[in-house]
């Protein structure tokens, strides 16, 4: 290889182009299948760290199964992202001086498609930068013809079964976009607010009942005052009427357990049309529902005329002013509370009573719960199944209509008397209408579109060709695993399970792996406002896609958020260089890569040891990947490559490579190359670019497959024997000597004299046989079996007593003093941590990861203190 260092910018685009040109991402026929569907990113999106983690995990699994001879499909695609895309294109048109309402729906949709064709592949190209090996020939889009056909079929069939219906209910309403939105599109923000105390006059009395509210403007739609049945303060008022100030309407004081005696005054104004909890109270008590706002958030004709047409927040100011003037106002207090904002419009969301289309999610949830209960679909980590059931057991009707133009238009048409005809297309709707009216009539199509989550709920089977093309459905459905974030378990995962069970009577995936969040190095959520957002593309450019992938995978511990720092990525970039340098070492030492298809002869101890380590590492990686312990699998691969192979085996091998024993040298070259080849295969699913580059440069494969990506996963078993134990003893001795030098602040490169007190001839023969290796790696000048008259330190390693000799001018007392000072410092730090951990308040209030880190720090310091004690004792 020409480069001393690995230069990723010369490699990654080139390698990815090779893979694509050779169609390596397509499934190759085999008896067993492995399939994954990508969580479709929004077509408006750009790669963020959550995408990077999610897709690194998927690509690891896909590449691993491909190398294990599975017919592997990774189905890619993007989501049309109704609200996000429409808002973005509207903004662009407005900047160009174009009003969407003037050009009309059809022309506007054309503009959206134009934007999609120009910008829609940006995030897919960014996924390629990460190394994702999706079958791009099957790239799907939720507005594609086949996906649209699936959506229509599902809607029509669910409507026929009575599982889709139209109803008037309270929904999250965006007054800027003028559409219903899902809970996931609502951002609950903690803000500085005020709570207002207002008196409502009691009928036929000079008394008042005082309520507290953060939204006095909604009193225009009040239909009751609620008090708790157990609250004795209001028992004498239950059943009486009060007058709503300003409005003059009489409303009743009722009992309902929703009223909390500890909140506010204990008396609660009920506005069923503009609060979700109030709506439930209204349903239980058969209260009138009065909508007082327009779709744009202005006061409507149901309010006193002087308020009609006012913006809701302007109305609030006017109401407070009038309440004060009429002496109904008691006081106001500053508070902090959570207020719902639309994540696209940045406007405050209004609970709004409106007619919408709904799915009877409760009925669909029955099979969806059974499939998880029966373990046909399993969550990893398992505790996420509890979250799944909590949501499913409290499921509400799902509002699926949106007042947008971009999306799947609802296949419903209205007759002259507003009768609804649901059909696949207008022709069928007209035929149904003709049968109903006994004549041809004009129909008007419902202008609303479906919630984006409706179409993405069909993703696992619609992308495979359902309903018309069953070949891929039969082969790859159910999919093997879904990799997703916890925030969409209900919005997406549950709905895919519901639709999969309803239409294919099969779970859409066997496993659901739920990964954690990627946060900054301090454990804070990344946000633009905090200025702590780390762009994955910047890290890829600076350190390589492989370094970023390996960082994320090595930190993907179940239930623990990833605390990402640039230094970690930089550290794993060094790992790539270590691998690159190992390859250069093999080339320099004439290792032959063309003769390593079969397991080599293993007669030399270090060769037996590294082969045993290889098989053990392979087995650990397989188990950890099966258990979705990506962090442990990455650790296994890293430790074996960096420490076992590079730090130890290659160093041990130098004593043979630089000897005169040609037969031994040939075996070491063979084993070095063979094990390195297996390392490339083991590492490839984690770091595909650098491993493929080394593989292709060395022409490792002569089976015709050429590419590492298509190589077979390592196989083989190996039983450990005494020869392997000997190598491990050498490593243990050298490690202890190096640590001992470090404790004594002796230069690691300096040579020392050692004598060994052994208890058997067998042990003596071990040191005789391995004297050359021990001297070279342990930086030992002389190895004696007798005592010397010099300053001495002793240590025990693997049952043997070692005496380390120093030059006459070494001041052992000064060394002892320095060690004691350091030991005392560590002990002080231990005491401080011990006090913190004994403080129940700290343990209960501090984040779990902080407490765990303190425990780890304590144990590390304890080990250091004990180690120094042993060292001092040996001096």
Curated annotation (Swiss-Prot):
Motif ('KMSKS' region): 525-529
Primary subcellular site in the record, as a coarse category: cytoplasm
EC category name: ligase
A GO biological-process term: valyl-tRNA aminoacylation
Chain location of the short sequence motif 'HIGH' region per the record: 41-51
Binding site for ATP: 528
Subcellular compartments: Cytoplasm
Coiled-coil ranges from the UniProt annotation: 810-875
Classification via InterPro entries: aa-tRNA-synth_I_CS (IPR001412), aa-tRNA-synth_Ia (IPR002300), Anticodon_Ia_Val (IPR033705), M/V/L/I-tRNA-synth_anticd-bd (IPR013155), Rossmann-like_a/b/a_fold (IPR014729), tRNA-bd_arm (IPR010978), tRNAsynth_Ia_anticodon-bd (IPR009080), Val-tRNA_synth_C_sf (IPR037118)
GO molecular function: aminoacyl-tRNA deacylase activity; ATP binding; valine-tRNA ligase activity
Listed EC numbers: 6.1.1.9
Keyword Ion transport attributed: no
A single GO cellular-component term on record: cytosol
Entry keyword set: Aminoacyl-tRNA synthetase, ATP-binding, Coiled coil, Cytoplasm, Ligase, Nucleotide-binding, Protein biosynthesis
UniProt function note: Catalyzes the attachment of valine to tRNA(Val). As ValRS can inadvertently accommodate and process structurally similar amino acids such as threonine, to avoid such errors, it has a 'posttransfer' editing activity that hydrolyzes mischarged Thr-tRNA(Val) in a tRNA-dependent manner.
UniProt subunit comment: Monomer.
Domains (record comment): ValRS has two distinct active sites: one for aminoacylation and one for editing. The misactivated threonine is translocated from the active site to the editing site. The C-terminal coiled-coil domain is crucial for aminoacylation activity.
Name recorded for this polypeptide: Valine--tRNA ligase
Species for this entry: Pelagibacter ubique (strain HTCC1062)
Gene assigned in the entry: valS
């Amino acid at each position: 290889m020409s480069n001393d260092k690995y230069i990723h910018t010369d490699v990654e685009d080139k390698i990815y182009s090779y893979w694509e040109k050779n169609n390596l991402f397509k499934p190759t026929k085999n008896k067993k299948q492995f399939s994954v569907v990508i969580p479709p990113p929004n077509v408006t999106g750009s790669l963020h760290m959550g995408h990077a983690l999610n897709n690194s995990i998927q690509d690891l699994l896909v590449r691993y199964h491909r190398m294990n001879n599975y017919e592997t499909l990774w189905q890619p695609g993007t989501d049309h992202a109704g609200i996000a895309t429409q808002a973005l294109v509207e903004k662009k048109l407005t900047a160009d001086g174009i009003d969407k309402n003037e050009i009309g729906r059809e022309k506007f949709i054309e503009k959206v498609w134009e934007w999609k064709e120009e910008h829609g592949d940006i995030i897919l190209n960014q996924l390629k930068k990460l190394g994702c090996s999706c079958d791009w020939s099957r790239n799907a889009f939720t507005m594609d013809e086949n996906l649209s056909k699936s959506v229509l079929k599902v809607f029509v069939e669910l409507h026929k079964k009575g599982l889709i219906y139209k109803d008037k209910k309270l929904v999250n309403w965006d007054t800027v976009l003028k559409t219903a939105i899902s809970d996931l599109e609502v951002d609950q923000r903690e803000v500085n607010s005020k709570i207002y105390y207002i008196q409502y006059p009691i009928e036929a009395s000079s008394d008042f009942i005082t309520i507290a509210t953060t939204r006095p403007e909604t009193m225009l739609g009040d239909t009751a005052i609620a008090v708790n049945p157990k609250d004795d303060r209001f028992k004498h008022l239950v059943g009486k009427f009060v007058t709503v100030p300003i409005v003059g309407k009489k409303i009743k004081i009722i009992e309902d357990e929703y009223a909390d005696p500890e909140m506010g005054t204990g008396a609660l104004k009920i506005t069923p049309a503009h609060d979700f909890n109030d709506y439930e109270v209204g349903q239980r008590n058969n209260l009138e529902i009065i909508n007082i706002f327009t779709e744009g958030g202005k006061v409507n004709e149901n309010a006193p005329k002087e308020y009609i047409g006012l913006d809701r927040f302007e109305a609030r100011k006017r109401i407070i002013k009038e309440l004060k003037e009429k002496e109904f106002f008691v006081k106001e207090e500053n508070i902090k509370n959570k207020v719902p904002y639309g994540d696209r419009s940045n406007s405050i969301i209004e609970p709004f009573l409106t007619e919408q289309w709904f799915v009877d999610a409760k009925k669909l949830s029955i099979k969806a719960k059974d499939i998880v209960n029966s373990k046909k679909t399993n969550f990893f980590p398992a505790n996420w199944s509890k979250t799944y059931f909590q949501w499913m057991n409290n499921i509400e009707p799902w509002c699926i209509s949106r007042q947008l133009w971009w999306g799947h238009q609802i296949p419903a048409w209205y007759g002259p008397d507003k009768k609804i005809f649901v059909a696949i297309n207008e022709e069928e709707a007209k035929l149904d209408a003709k049968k109903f009216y006994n004549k041809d009539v004009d129909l008007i199509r419902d202008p609303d579109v479906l919630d984006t989550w409706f179409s993405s709920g069909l993703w696992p089977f619609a992308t495979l060709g359902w309903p018309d093309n069953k070949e891929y459905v039969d082969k790859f459905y159910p999919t093997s695993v879904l990799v997703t974030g916890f925030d969409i378990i209900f919005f997406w995962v549950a709905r895919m399970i519901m639709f999969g069970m309803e239409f294919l009577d099969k779970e859409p995936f066997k496993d659901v792996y739920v990964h954690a969040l990627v946060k900054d190095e301090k454990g804070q959520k990344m946000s633009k406002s905090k200025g702590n957002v780390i762009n994955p593309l910047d890290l890829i450019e600076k350190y390589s896609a492989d370094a970023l992938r390996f960082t994320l995978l090595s930190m993907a511990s179940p239930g623990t958020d990833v605390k990402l720092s640039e230094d970690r990525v930089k550290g794993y970039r060094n790992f790539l260089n270590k691998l690159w340098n190992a390859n250069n070492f093999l080339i320099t030492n004439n290792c032959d890569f063309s003769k390593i298809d079969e397991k080599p002869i293993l007669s030399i101890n270090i060769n037996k040891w590294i082969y045993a380590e290889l098989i053990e590492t392979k087995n650990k990686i397989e188990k950890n990947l099966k258990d979705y312990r990506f962090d442990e699998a990455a650790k296994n691969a890293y430790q074996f490559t960096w420490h076992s192979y590079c730090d130890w085996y290659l160093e041990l091998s130098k004593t043979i490579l630089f000897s005169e024993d040609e037969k031994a040298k040939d075996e070491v070259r063979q084993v070095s190359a063979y094990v390195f080849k297996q390392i490339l295969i083991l590492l490839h699913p984690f770091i595909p670019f650098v491993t493929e580059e080394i593989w292709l440069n060395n022409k490792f494969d002569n089976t015709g497959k050429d590419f590492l990506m298509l190589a077979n996963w390592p196989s083989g078993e190996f039983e450990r024997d005494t020869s392997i134990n000997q190598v491990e003893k050498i490593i243990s001795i050298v490690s202890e000597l190096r640590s001992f030098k470090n404790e004594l602040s002796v230069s690691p490169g300096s040579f020392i004299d050692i004598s060994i007190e052994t208890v058997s001839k067998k042990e003596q023969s071990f040191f005789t046989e391995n004297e050359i290796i021990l001297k070279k790696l342990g930086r030992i000048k002389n190895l004696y079996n007798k005592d010397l008259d010099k300053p001495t330190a002793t240590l025990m390693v693997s049952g043997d007593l070692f005496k380390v000799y120093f030059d006459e001018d070494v001041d052992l007392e000064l060394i002892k003093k320095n060690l004691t000072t350091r030991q005392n410092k560590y002990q002080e730090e231990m005491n401080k941590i011990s006090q913190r951990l004994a403080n129940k308040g700290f343990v209960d209030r501090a984040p779990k990861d902080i407490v765990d880190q303190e425990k780890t720090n304590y144990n590390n310091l304890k080990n250091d203190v004990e180690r120094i004690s042993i060292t001092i004792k040996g001096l």
